Design a protein with these regions (language model features):
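Formylglycine-dependent sulfatase
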Residues: 2, 16-457, 462-463, 472-479
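Residues forming the ATP-binding cleft of Hanks-type serine/threonine protein kinase domains
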Residues: 469
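Sec-dependent signal peptide recognition
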Residues: 1-7
Length: 479
């Protein structure tokens, strides 16, 4: 007589279905402040990102991917919970994440996944829902970073992006192979102050990047955009941001003192020598021919982008290493690879660096996926998606029903292909942090395919409306 497995009897059919359709592994790679303009798969011409392009080329690329609050900690909380900031309670960078909340890693772990997070966490609380965690405290350091591994703090010599990738590969190699896994590989790069690996110092030498058409924006009719302190010309620091010292002649500013002290304490002697060789010559060259006005603004843009893109080069190189390992380990067919950033970033548009605003460059974020076998979607996906969608997506892929209070929409229907008949027609955004760094005023808004409506509130009561078809750079407020 043939025995029927207990798990397949009525009442527990869900477990049987999950066994029949193997749960995919999840590798979730996220960077900090990586603008889509600096990924060649998105049509960017500033740099080449072959490994990131490989994810898009072998899978899908979302052309309209957005965040719900363009600042680090709230964005991470939204990703974990699948909820907007007002619903998960984490509205700005100054708060401590309520780790008692339901998150997708916790639910995956309960469903039998082995879970890990390695790299940047930035939520002021210890990770929960993970079998293993090894995180950077706070913002972390590019060079010889401190890590907190399951409560134990230590310092590791090396470059953060490479170290995080090494740790991720080691964890995947040594995991419990009887279980599906989910690992969050979260990089510090390319966050300010853009400290490249010494092996990338030869890239983008003597740069002459294209200047955005609205680099010298006067913000006419856009009070919300005018009231900020994120100007490359006015607010970017010569020493710690651009690595140019000695601009005050024989005197040394406090900013320069702090910058030099940090380097001396953090870098090894070999790293420090390489750093000095690179940036002292740049400082001498600048100080021999100091600039003012528009020429100085463009110099700062080039200097900023050079180091920003160098840090991305390390991300791309190490992402390629991780992809190669996954393929060589025989995991490709049943692993989804996701690449995104916690938000977008300004690369000179409107004269800015940083993020925070609902304008396109910081509202948008890259999102690319290489899919497991059985998914038909390929190439471009044009529907509007948001970072709160990733949590329910991961859960549905694992055969877990998302909680009813998750506000995101699972992307699985888009991944199965062909295009879905019905999808959302608008997105909600809300930035809260004020007063705060860069003085960006709080605002909320709604975006459709064609229009964007923004309300700046508090000290400033100001409305803006943009027609994104005729004004893609958001220069003409229709109100």
């Amino acid at each position: 007589m043939r025995l029927i497995p207990l798990l397949c009897i009525p009442g527990v059919i869900t477990s049987c279905q999950v066994r029949e359709h193997e749960q995919p592994n999840i590798v979730f790679i996220m960077t900090d402040d990586h603008g889509y303009q600096a990924i060649s798969a998105y049509g960017g011409t500033l740099n080449s990102t072959p490994a990131l392009d490989r994810i898009a080329g072998e899978g899908v690329i979302f052309r309209n991917s957005f965040v719900c609050n363009s600042i680090s900690a709230p964005s991470r909380a939204a990703l974990l919970t699948g909820k907007h900031s007002h619903a998960n309670g984490h509205t700005d960078n100054r708060q401590r994440f309520d780790s008692s909340q339901v998150t997708f890693p916790r639910l995956l772990r309960e469903a039998g996944y082995q879970t890990a997070v390695i790299g940047k966490w930035h939520l002021q609380s210890e990770p929960t829902g993970f079998d293993y965690w090894n995180i950077l405290p706070g913002q972390g350091s590019y060079y010889n970073p401190d890590f907190i591994e399951m409560g134990r703090r230590y310092r590791q010599e090396g470059y953060a992006t490479t170290l995080i990738t090494d740790m991720a590969i080691d964890w995947i190699r040594d995991r419990d192979k009887s279980k599906p896994f989910c690992i969050l590989v979260h990089h510090k790069a390319p966050h300010r102050n853009w400290m490249p690996d010494t092996i990338d110092f030869d890239l983008f030498d003597d740069p002459d990047f294209p200047v955005p058409g609205n680099f010298f924006d006067d913000y006419e009719g856009r009070k919300g955009a005018e009231l900020q302190k994120m100007s490359i010309f006015k607010d970017m620091r010569m020493a710690s941001d651009l690595k140019i010292t000695g601009t005050d002649g024989d005197s040394i500013t406090q900013s320069e003192k702090d910058y030099i002290s940090y380097l001396e304490k953090r870098l090894t002697p070999q790293q420090y020598r390489a750093w000095q060789n690179e940036y002292e010559s740049l400082s001498r060259s600048y100080n021999a021919h100091p600039l003012t006005g528009d020429s100085l603004a463009i110099f700062k843009l080039n200097r900023y982008l050079s180091d920003y893109l160098r840090t991305i080069q390390s991300v791309d190189r190490n992402t390629g290493r991780l992809l190669d390992f996954i393929d060589s380990a025989g995991l490709r067919d049943n692993t989804i690879i996701v690449y995104t950033s916690d938000q977008g970033f300004y690369l000179g548009e409107h004269g800015w660096f940083d993020k925070r605003f609902m304008y396109e460059e910081s509202f948008r974020t890259p999102l690319m996926m290489r899919l497991p076998q059985g998914f038909e979607a390929k190439g471009d996906i044009g529907e509007m998606v948001q970072n709160i969608d990733l949590a329910p997506t991961f859960l549905e892929l694992a055969g877990v029903s998302p909680p009813d209070d998750m506000q995101g929409m699972s992307l699985v229907p888009l991944l199965r292909g062909p295009a879905v008949k019905k999808w959302r027609d608008a997105l909600y955004y809300h930035y809260y942090e004020y007063p705060g760094e860069h003085d960006t005023r709080p605002h909320y808004g709604v975006r459709t395919d064609r229009y964007k409506l923004i309300h700046f509130y508090g000290e400033t009561d100001h409305w803006e409306l943009y027609d994104l078809e005729s004004d893609q750079h958001e220069m003409k407020n229709l109100i």
